[in-house]
């Protein structure tokens, strides 16, 4: 990993270059066949290989009493990306489609991301936030080259005065490539409020306040199958949660030392 930084007045310029390995999950490698629906089977491919991912990130940061801004430009390349693959077969004298995986040619994504925080009173009383990005995704596999746009957008407002506080966060979902499908971001419409007295905090949370929870996905373009899914949970609009917490460490000196950082990047994911 390469990291270079140049300090500016009220900000900085940073250049990062990183690389990593993406390992296939155990379910991606398993030859066990499962029935999704009659006529559609799902099976892993033990011949799928791990892929390498690398690319540069250029980031600009600005910070003063009223404004915090971060803008990034990036380009990430993945060789032999793991992508879905479909073919026809005969199971118990019936024609069926098998959904499996293969190593495609490449996956290339590039674009820009941004985050803006504005404090009109130059303190924590009121904060306005917006963030998002514009990303171009290019995937090349057995079915040709596919190009998509991903443009997430999120926003929020925080209020804090004395012992009271409240916030609201929302977003506009956009679809991005996730292994098998192009999946939409999870919709977000969350409200929270709290009152804090010493170590005690009393909270109220509301999720999906103005819209139901909605999850969408669509298979990549291919000549064999077009699969679209949509799940809507309307009851979540009435979800409210009350919370009471006590901080036993409030006002106490904390001295924590981290001795071990053990991370298993090759952990399997059973489905």
What is the role of each PLM region?
Residues 9-54, 75-94, 211-226:
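Surface-exposed extracellular loop regions of Gram-negative outer-membrane beta-barrel proteins
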Residues 8, 17-23, 32-33, 54, ...:
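Transmembrane beta-strands of outer-membrane beta-barrel pores
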Residues 43-45, 49, 62, 68-130, ...:
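Outer membrane beta-barrel strand-and-loop segments of large Gram-negative receptors
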Residues 132-137, 150-196, 200-201, 205-228:
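C-terminal beta-barrel architecture of Gram-negative outer-membrane proteins
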Residues 197-271:
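C-terminal beta-signal and adjacent terminal beta-strands/loops
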Residues 22-28, 69, 78-86, 125-127, ...:
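Outer-membrane beta-barrel proteins
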